[in-house]
């Protein structure tokens, strides 16, 4: 029996995670879920986004399923829950899969998750604020190995997106990435981040495995969601040496919280990635979601009228219709990403 920590978070987080748990339970009985509080509501009660005793219990889990968190501009001393978890658990690799189920294609982005401009380090006084863009050898080497192995296992190339023509930190990062790729005989295409955004919009399907720094990767993956139909269907995994956290990449969307119209697909696919990481099989969920999306009856963010409950029930119905081994060839590599990444970590 696998132990999975559940942090539903704020806004629509509880709604989409409840949906994901229902779907997981429809395909396996080998997971026990343990719920922990976290997010802005916890900060308002305890002064921290997650309590230390809860964090210690979470470290003992096999994986984490995370919803969404609100990070307001105007709450003094509040630190983002997800950034706190990434730092505390050293979740250094962020894998984002942007699927287009109608085309049966995907964009895969590997984002360095612990350093760069999101390192949370800097200095300020009343006249100046500085955020440090930190790239360390350790951080660059481990994310490069992660992305290069993923590219090699999928028999594709690596697209390294940077700003090395301007930033010294990216020159350092670039050298390490190229050295590791050369040793593993993986081809690297280099792209300057500015011009790459145009390629990502116009011709996204021949980019191999995309690797970039923390902030660049965050922005690029959000931009890429235009090819998915909605940010609400995009899953992600945050991988460390000892544990991994899975979350939809969308925010807490407080404007629609409680209305029953949040898109649960990103959370459901994140749970599928979690199953693969645990050595179970998330492929049936990918297949069922693909069939459901192609049939239609989607939530308002995808120009539909369906509720969260209707989408969840529809996906579970598709699961029950599927033969366990009925998997589209085009998705075979993708649905086993978690296993590949488990070997890396």
From Swiss-Prot:
Ligand binding (Mg(2+)): 194, 218, 222
Enzyme class: oxidoreductase
Annotated positions binding NADH: 69-71, 165, 251-255, 263
EC code: 1.1.1.286
GO BP, sorted A to Z: isocitrate metabolic process; L-leucine biosynthetic process; lysine biosynthetic process via aminoadipic acid; tricarboxylic acid cycle
Assigned keywords, A-Z: Magnesium, Manganese, Metal-binding, NAD, Oxidoreductase
SMART domains with a match to the protein in the record: Iso_dh
GO molecular function terms attached to this record: 3-isopropylmalate dehydrogenase activity; homoisocitrate dehydrogenase activity; isocitrate dehydrogenase (NAD+) activity; isocitrate-homoisocitrate dehydrogenase activity; magnesium ion binding; NAD binding; NADP binding
Catalytic activity: D-threo-isocitrate + NAD(+) = 2-oxoglutarate + CO2 + NADH; (2R,3S)-homoisocitrate + NAD(+) = 2-oxoadipate + CO2 + NADH
Pathway annotation from the record: Amino-acid biosynthesis; L-lysine biosynthesis via AAA pathway; L-alpha-aminoadipate from 2-oxoglutarate: step 4/5
Entry similarity comment: Belongs to the isocitrate and isopropylmalate dehydrogenases family.
Protein name per the record: Isocitrate/homoisocitrate dehydrogenase
């Amino acid at each position: 029996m696998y132990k999975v920590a559940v942090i539903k978070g704020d806004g629509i987080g509880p709604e989409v995670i409840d949906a994901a748990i229902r779907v997981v339970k429809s395909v396996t009985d080998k997971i026990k879920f343990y719920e922990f509080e976290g997010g802005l509501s916890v900060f308002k009660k305890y002064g921290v986004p997650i309590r230390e005793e809860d964090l210690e219990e979470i470290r003992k889990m096999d994986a984490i399923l995370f919803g969404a968190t609100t990070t307001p501009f105007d709450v003094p001393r509040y630190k983002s829950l997800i950034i706190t978890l990434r730092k505390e658990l050293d979740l250094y690799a962020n894998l984002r899969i942007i699927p287009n189920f109608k085309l049966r294609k995907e964009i895969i982005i590997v984002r360095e998750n612990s350093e760069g401009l999101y390192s949370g380090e800097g200095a300020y006084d009343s006249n100046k604020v500085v955020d440090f863009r930190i790239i360390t050898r350790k951080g660059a080497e481990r994310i490069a190995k992660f992305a290069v192995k993923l590219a090699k296992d999928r028999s594709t190339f690596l697209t390294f997106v940077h700003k090395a023509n301007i930033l010294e930190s990216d020159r350092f990062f670039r050298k390490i990435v190229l050295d590791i790729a050369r040793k593993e005989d993986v081809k690297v295409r280099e792209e300057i981040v500015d011009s790459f955004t145009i390629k990502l919009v116009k011709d996204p399907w021949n980019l191999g495995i995309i690797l970039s720094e923390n902030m660049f990767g965050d922005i690029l993956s959000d931009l890429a969601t235009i090819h998915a139909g909605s940010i609400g269907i995009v899953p992600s995994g945050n991988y460390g040496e000892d544990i991994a956290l899975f979350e939809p990449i969308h925010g807490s969307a407080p404007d629609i919280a409680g209305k029953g119209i949040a898109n649960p697909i990103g959370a459901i696919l994140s749970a599928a990635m979690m199953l693969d990481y645990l050595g179970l099989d998330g492929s049936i969920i990918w297949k069922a979601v693909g069939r459901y999306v192609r049939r239609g009856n989607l939530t308002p963010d995808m120009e539909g009228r369906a509720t969260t409950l209707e989408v969840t029930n529809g996906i579970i119905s598709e699961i029950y219709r599927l033969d366990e081994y009925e998997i589209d060839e085009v998705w075979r590599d993708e649905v086993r990403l978690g296993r590949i990444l488990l070997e890396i970590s």
